[in-house]
Amino acid sequence: MDNILRRGSLEMTAAMLISGTIGWFVLVSGQPVLDVVFWRCVFGAATLLLICGLFGFLRPGLLSRTTFLLAVLSGVAIVGNWVLLFASYSRASIAIGTAVYNVQPFMLVGLAALFLGEKISVQKLSWLGLAFLGMLAIVSAHGEQGVGGDQYLLGIALALGAALLYAFAALIIKRLTGTPPHLIALIQVCTGVLLLAPWANWSALPQTSTAWASLLTLGIVHTGVMYVLLYGAIQKLPTALTGALSFIYPIAAILVDWLAFGHRLGLLQWIGVAAILLAAAGMQQGWGSATRKTVTS
């Protein structure tokens, strides 16, 4: 059991560290956002097709028509999420875009309450309030940015839109229980290829090896390999540990943004980032619920 937990922890850590470098590869590629997402889907689809074939997930009859359509719908949301998140990096910075993106658990809670009738506890509302205060701190710091204030605010709005689309995708995927997650991911990126092919800039393909290397890495490593590591870890780890290790992602992204691009967060931004990540961790780990049960019992 210890070996399983150790392996799962290593897989989850590796997956989150890989995720933390996505923004760097997006910006280094030097390509328009739609082209970056398109090529990520192309190379990711090729990688996941190979992985699904090796795992035996391509056999006929594995998917019903409803399951397939839901997976396609989740793919539309995931691809839109990538477009908005990647667009936020050049406007609000990788660190801020990633931090704001981490409000997604709260959006998922809100959507579940709206569409599934799930109740929102006082504890979750408290964490939501803290995350909102963090957002206010980040937004109020727009004057400190070297870029125009409007671009900074647009970057935050794009990251929020990305988080909302991810929450929609997660809500749809909840209905795909029992479907191999690698196959869901394959359908999602194939959906992205079909959606973005008409918008891809075929007349101005990347001209440098750096651009192609970045796009290949985003497709093969950040999509194919990362999904295998992530889903492997989720199968081995308890939910609480999975949630805790997931915060390696934003921390890694903040460090990459600082080391690679010299983007240093101001005091208000640090306060906002810390508040959002603390609130997300508190809600995912259920902090406060145990105390409340003790008091009421």
Predicted regions and their residues:
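Hydrophobic/aromatic residues within transmembrane alpha-helices
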Residues: S29, V36, R40, S88, ...
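Glycine-/small-residue-enriched transmembrane alpha-helix faces in small-molecule transporters
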Residues: M1-F38, L73-V76, L84, G146-R175, ...
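Specific alpha-helical transmembrane segments that line the substrate/conduction pathway
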Residues: D35, V42-A46, F86-K119, T239-W258
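Helix-helix packing/entry segments at the starts of transmembrane helices
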Residues: S9-L10, G97-V103, I172-T191, T223-L259
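Juxtamembrane helix-entry segments on the extracytoplasmic side of multipass membrane proteins
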Residues: I4-G8, G30-F38, L62-F68, S140-L165, ...
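Hydrophobic transmembrane alpha-helices of multi-pass small-molecule transport proteins
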Residues: L48, C52, V72, L111, ...
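Transmembrane alpha-helices of multi-pass small-molecule transport proteins
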Residues: Q31-G80, M107-L108, L165-A169, A185-S203, ...
